[in-house]
Amino acid sequence: GFGSTGKYSQRPAFDFIAQAISGFMSLNGSEKTGPVRTAAPISDLIAGLYCAFGIVSAINARHNTKKGQVVETSLTSSLISLMAYLSAEYFVTDKTPKKSGNDHPILSPYGLFKTKDGNIAIAPANDKLCEIFLRTLNLEYLLEVDLYKTNSLRMINRNKLNEIINQTTELNTTDYWIKKLNESGCPAGKVLDMKEALNDQLVEDTDMVLSLIHISEPTRQSL
């Protein structure tokens, strides 16, 4: 869980503990929920991927050096490595990043918005996409409002901006907005549950589900 050397090396661990100690949980959820773990055992999965990549890299290096290498990974280090720009923000500002829920910690507008029949995830990840997003919603006038002219200002006034956006997105269905936004070039998608996701056309198109045939048991499906 913590690597083969150092203070924590002999401590027992599972994914949940790694999520807690790595700081990962502290960034999930909102101020109301407190720390929240991810539904999937992400440290187990990421550590396994890093290990596989390390093994392949060591095998490739052996062709040139004729020497083997020790490949090691840990649950906690794997999660810490995923902090990316969040850790960069801390190193530069010395400020601990706060939970942002479904909002983005450094971008606005960005997140989950209400529709006539549910919710929609929308990700205008730069100024150009923000302009496209607001124009698609017929809210381009906001681009001229002093409160929202830059991303920094939109972050400061995010609650009010989200309120205005929600008032518009609630007028039509999720599918309506997904079509409109994707056609305009703005990334948007529906929030699917497990059943919906595994039966979505994307899963079929990418051959993600396998049929496992057993001689004495019914055929099972698996990813």
What kind of region is each of these model predictions?
Residues G1-I120, P124:
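Active-site-adjacent "lid/gating" segments in soluble enzymes
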Residues Y8-Q10, L153-R158, D200-E204:
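Short secondary-structure transition/capping segments
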